[in-house]
Amino acid sequence: MKTIFLDLATIHAGNSHSSLNADNVLTIGNFDGVHLGHQAMLKQLKQSASEQQLDTMVMIFEPQPREYFAQLKSDLSSAPARLTSQDEKLTLLAEFGIDTVVVAKFDEAFRSLSASEFADMLVHHLNVKSLVLGDDFKFGHDRTGDSEFLRNYGLPVTNLHTITDTQVVDTQESSLLEDKRISSTRIRELSAKGDLKTVS
């Protein structure tokens, strides 16, 4: 597995990672814990890559966005505890057979990217040809970008439906089952309550 450490300062200096990569299908997230929801996303990523004859690429963030904003507020306790370290994430993603992981430096420059600038970066610097995203994925400054924005930009997007404890539910129903949604946040809450049976 190839690991790319992405710093916008480097990109703005004129350096590109495009020569390092084949064409890619990308998914984006914290992937903290690589739980069942993440695993479903990665399986869909690999399926899409196989169908489109592309390499698999995962973008994660360092620090994680909530950690960055907690530092800004000088309130580190407001950031959730990690389920996995960066090195553990990279190991898990390698074991899953991902071709490339992009570790994006989440800083003021990154959080200030407009949706268009973010999409430009994916296409021109990371050779992204399509994406696999969760149904609630937002990006860009003030979270103005979403899957529909990317489609209008010209990037095909496969949306994975919400993963719950017992089933995969349709996107339209996902808001009704938010309490059952598999997420790193929910796993932390269940662990804190000692509900290890549900966590596993």
Where are the regions that the model predicts?
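Nucleotidyltransferase catalytic core that binds NTPs
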Residues: 1-200
